[in-house]
Amino acid sequence: MKTYIIHYTKLEDRKNNILSFLSNTDCDYEFITDYDKEEIEGNKYYFADEEKFNDKIKNLWDSRIHRFRIINPAEISCTIKHILAIEKIAHQKENIGLILEDDAIPIENNFVDKIQQLIDTAPDNWDSIFMGAGCGIDFMNQKLRESRLINERFAQVKHPSTNCAEAYLLKKESAKRIYDSIIPFQLVSDWELAYQFYKLDMNVYWAIPPLFYQGSKSGEYDSTLR
């Protein structure tokens, strides 16, 4: 299973940390480095369209709170990199790909074995499995109360079904469908993914407990998206 790492090239400490835990595994990995925020001018991926933005928001979130905005260069860059990773999964030989953001930190050293255990025991109909702690335990608990517990490892989550996007699995066929639908995007990465999952009626599961946490949420890194 190939791993694609969303990486802003100026954050060398994040790259070094990712390499420190991947180097102890037999993972095949690739850093997604094109379209840093300084390189997004004239890109084909993002189009600021107020009508489309509002159409996406109203289906899943409170449009009275989440008003139209032009997302910032760092957010555009991050979202493009996710799309590039999704494209690579859509065209790879293997049936499953893993996407990590460069601030993802494994909770346990044997995370590769844990991921394989998830894949081996997941419901057959999954399109994506989110494995990160994302917004934190309070958000997870609230969302899980509204979700369908499959077993002690999985919950099938209602839309919007993302929890940040620091660590998630995608099936190849699901990646193809997302890639064919997502360009041009209007929302930041995890929200745009949430909309695409909803639009394409995909089955999204959360791993219980999560296998990764987000260094920019825990305070180990400064967030670079704002």
What are these regions (language model features)?
Residues 1-100, 104-226:
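An acidic/histidine-cluster motif and surrounding catalytic segment
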